Swiss-Prot record:
<keyword id="KW-0645">Protease</keyword>
<feature type="binding site">
    <location>
        <position position="244"/>
    </location>
    <ligand>
        <name>a divalent metal cation 1</name>
    </ligand>
</feature>
<feature type="compositionally biased region" description="Basic residues">
    <location>
        <begin position="97"/>
        <end position="113"/>
    </location>
</feature>
<dbReference type="InterPro" id="IPR018349">
    <property type="entry name" value="Pept_M24A_MAP2_BS"/>
</dbReference>
<dbReference type="InterPro" id="IPR036390">
    <property type="entry name" value="WH_DNA-bd_sf"/>
</dbReference>
<dbReference type="InterPro" id="IPR002468">
    <property type="entry name" value="Pept_M24A_MAP2"/>
</dbReference>
<dbReference type="GO" id="GO:0051604">
    <property type="term" value="P:protein maturation"/>
</dbReference>
<feature type="compositionally biased region" description="Low complexity">
    <location>
        <begin position="84"/>
        <end position="93"/>
    </location>
</feature>
<comment type="similarity">
    <text>Belongs to the peptidase M24A family. Methionine aminopeptidase eukaryotic type 2 subfamily.</text>
</comment>
<keyword id="KW-0963">Cytoplasm</keyword>
<dbReference type="InterPro" id="IPR036388">
    <property type="entry name" value="WH-like_DNA-bd_sf"/>
</dbReference>
<feature type="binding site">
    <location>
        <position position="454"/>
    </location>
    <ligand>
        <name>a divalent metal cation 2</name>
    </ligand>
</feature>
<dbReference type="Pfam" id="PF00557">
    <property type="entry name" value="Peptidase_M24"/>
</dbReference>
<dbReference type="InterPro" id="IPR001714">
    <property type="entry name" value="Pept_M24_MAP"/>
</dbReference>
<keyword id="KW-0031">Aminopeptidase</keyword>
<dbReference type="InterPro" id="IPR036005">
    <property type="entry name" value="Creatinase/aminopeptidase-like"/>
</dbReference>
<dbReference type="InterPro" id="IPR050247">
    <property type="entry name" value="Met_Aminopeptidase_Type2"/>
</dbReference>
Amino acid sequence: MSTDTSIKAGIDSIRAKADDLHLAEDSSNGTQANLDKHQIKATTAVGQDNGNNAGVADHKNDKNNKNNKNNNDDDDDDEDDDVAAAAAAVGDAGSDKKKKKKKSSNKKKKKKLVSIDQSYPDGVFPEGEWQEYGLDSNKYRTTSEEMRYLDRQQNNKWEDFRKGAEIHRRVRAKAKSSIRPGMTMIEIADLIENSVRAYASADHTLKAGIGFPTGLSLNHVAAHYTPNTGDKLTLGKDDLMKVDIGVHVNGRICDSAFTMTFNEDGKYDSIMQAVKEATNTGVKEAGIDVRLNDIGAAVQEVMESYEMELDGKTYPIKCIKNLNGHNIGDFIIHSGKTVPIVANGDMTKMEEGETFAIETFGSTGNGYVLPEGECSHYALNSGVESIKPPSDKAKHLLNTIQSNFGTLPWCRRYLERTGEEKYLFALNQLVKAGIVEDYPPIVDKRGSYTAQFEHTILLHPHKKEVVTRGDDY
């Protein structure tokens, strides 16, 4: 039975009882209250149908079960709103008083996103996916009490990452349920970034919030595209979009990315599967004392075992060999080591306590990217304190950058949120002086398709934690 039919039946029932029993006006109102009560119960039942999409499925210890029960606090539930509106409509129609009927609104109320801290008041956030280290030489770490003790000394650091990861899971869940073809890139970026701001309870601060500009690269554009103000680009049904989201808490950056497609014929399935499996392989191979070359070789073997058919032609899926995973430092997204996605001979080892972004890119094109297009991504270079800004305007802009972003990456839209206007000339001066680094979009050949998946991993002394893992990828 539909909701509308149920309401009508409820109204008829109330009126019939009122006629039979000759109820007074206040009795009628009491009956209506009971009806409202039943409708509210129905609303509650509908709301409880939501699952915990933001949590990590693999962990079923008591702490995580306690924490994960709060994940639905701010989920939108349109059906809840429909039922609540219906209950209110019954209340108006069932009254014996001659009241002017209120026009029903078709707008559905959306629950306001609230800080993640309200869901986890004790400050303990869900852990990621735990994986054993593969090397036999590391087996002693799993049982060593000393190793576990050393790990506990960094609990605050790990909780910062876990908080950022939980925000990331919620933001990407909202993005996946909301993004549709026809939206502009500006609309998509605002949706994602405003969600981060709401969950983190921060706008542009060095305490928590956006870790880097939201990447929304389409098709042959592999990375480093986010819209500048005035960009009219819209998402098309046949576009393959890489969504790269960064969230930081006290400078601990969670860097995780996924690829979205809206084409219903499954033509992108092969490249999506190839890149997702390649990233999972990189995560599996990573660990303390593992050589970076060995990770790249394993990723390459998986990625290049796939091919993709487009318009009757078969294309091998290639690793984009000049894109890599990377070390993550406090407030520094690319810190020191790079994790190749092809065998490159790098014998450098991963070390205990390090944090890495394991990301892979697959392409139907050349498997090599070059900078092209209008720049939107920027970051302050380190060790530039001795360089004098070339003008007063450049000095003013540098102060704005340092106070709002530090060494975190940012984009033009973020500058404008701080109140900066007519800043492009000063910005270019800072770039030319080497104080600020620009990161233009990087692209493979036109007509090709690229995909990306990425996770942040923490190398604990005894195990590795895939902190950004979720039910989705």
